[in-house]
Amino acid sequence: MKKLVLLLLPFLALISCRKPENVQRMEELLHGDWHGVEITNHLIAQGLWDTLHPHSITDVIASFDTLNGTFIVDSAGTTVDSASLVIDSDSVISVLGAVNAIDWSFDRTMINGFGQPVLQQLEAQFTGNQKFKILRITEDELILYFDEVVPVSIQGFTADMELRHTEYWQK
């Protein structure tokens, strides 16, 4: 009996290491190169003002390697960012160490003079780590989203800015 238990123990350990089927399917769909469509950044200071900044990212390719846990962003043949990729669940991923993300995810030319200091403060507080909700993933469409509240101070004025960030990608 003891030998049977010892033989079955490694088998049971292997079975318990399997990922749930829905996570495996999401990893299969996510893995590979995704071509940028658009990023929309919505900055909101509740009760004061808000501004919506959609911009094209058709020159950007995001490579999600779910096997090795890496995320690489390429623009016109040049790597502009790289990070670790963590699969948190079938609907949440984390990108860790994408230190240049603000550079490629905001179009600075669309942000007015008042918004520039806000962007600079977001940049100063950004760690390169972000948790994304997967709003939609199919074989040819990916929509990622996060929202975050960031305290911002400009010339003595302080407000909690909400950043709602949505990325649209296609295979």
Which role fits each region the language model picked out?
Residues M1-L4:
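Positively charged n-region of N-terminal signal peptides that target proteins for export
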Residues L7-L8:
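Sec-dependent N-terminal signal peptides
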Residues L14-S16:
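C-terminal motif of bacterial Sec signal peptides marking the signal peptidase cleavage site
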Residues R18-H35:
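N-terminal helix-cap/turn-to-beta initiation motif at the start of protein domains
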Residues H31-L52, A101, I143-V152:
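Buried hydrophobic residues that stabilize the cores of well-folded domains
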Residues N41-Q46, D59-E139:
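Contiguous, well-ordered beta-strand patches that form the walls/edges
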Residues D50-L52, L122-E123, Q155-D160:
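Short consensus segments that form the blades of beta-propeller domains
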Residues E139-K171:
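Edge beta-strand at a domain terminus
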